[in-house]
Amino acid sequence: MAADPSPPSAMAQPRPLNLNNEVVKMRKEVKRIRVLVIRKLVRSVSRLKSKKGSEDALLKNQRRAQRLLQEIHAMKELKPDVITKSALNDDINFEKTCKKPDSTATERAIARLAVHPLLKRKVDALKAAIQAFKDARQNAPEAESSKSASKESQCEDIPRSQAEASESQHPERTVVGEQKGKDKDPTTAKKAGSGSKEKLAKGKQGPKAVATPHSPGKPSEKGAGINSERQGAPTPGNHSQGKASTRTTEDSVCEPDDNSISKEEVSEEEKEYFDDSTEERFYKQSSASEDSDSGDDFFIGKVRRTRKKECAVPSSAKEQKPLPKVSSKTNTLETHWDIRNDKHKLIPEARKLESVFFHSLSGPKSSRRDPREQAPKNKAPDIPENEPPIQNKFTKSARRGFESAKQPSYAPLHPSWEASRRRKEQQSKIAVFQGKKITFDD
């Protein structure tokens, strides 16, 4: 039978193989295989006993059945560990054991169980694991010896490489030594020393000569008189360059100051501006007559306070401060501010002839186009233009009283409060006519 390609877990693990543990793990498999073999033998015994034929054939079948019963009893008495150990130790051949005339029932039972495919698969896997473990133990000292040999060879290679590197450097040293030997003569040494000194002096003088025109404040010792004369009478070009540099520095100093002042003014104007659209709309809708009196009253909140503070500041303090350079951003902000003020001043003047209930209808087209007061387009107007005026049932006295009720100006209220007040007034006027009896003349 072919061995199982997948070895057990113990084989895969690197720890040393413990055979006793593997034998103990095999107990369950051995018991299961023993039950299967006993069932098969019982069926074969019953088949042999049921066969019919001549007397010789019947006797032969009885002897076979007797031997199988002996094997069954031997299997029941055997322990699983004995079966696994015997299967691992020897290569058992069932046919050879059965042909032996002196073979016992236990031997035949062990051979029969060891030959079973399931147990044979497990046993072959264990044998392979044991063999691998033995090979690993045998190869371990060989591997250690090979490692030590490789380390020694590496250690030997390092000094060799160092020696080769030193040898490669030695020829240069020899050449330098020969040159030194040649230069030992006093005349040649003096000449070489004088030549080197001259070269050094020239090298030192070169950078000084180059540096003198750039740094007139540090003249050399040789040309001190010439440099002093040049310093005493500087050229006009240098003067102009110095003035230009001073101007550029002054401009660069002044520019950040102007920028900082303009930024501060812009930030102050942005802080001072406070536009609460809800308050503005409420103030316009509730008190149109008051708006017509004072042009700047539509500003609510912080704008009034800031304007009062600016008016309170004396003009002398403003004259003392120099006017800073205003940037283009501040100019644009001021123009926007003035345009907005002019627009808002024109709105209350145009609203002098407004009706009490419908501001948007009585005002001009420009006021109707104001997005804050423009009604949504999908809603139908309260009073269509083409319809005739509704015939009022009120008497002349009631109309006069209603008109007189319109005249007194109330204090500015919230729009919801004004609507509730008007609704109550209308209900009180209508309640007068509900209790009257209608009489008809004959």
Curated annotation (Swiss-Prot):
Transcription keyword on record: yes
Domain of life: Eukaryota
Protein name: Serum response factor-binding protein 1
GO biological processes: maturation of SSU-rRNA
Species per Swiss-Prot/TrEMBL record: Rattus norvegicus
Coiled coil start-end: 55-77, 118-140
Cellular localisation: Cytoplasm, Perinuclear region
Glycosyltransferase in keyword set: no
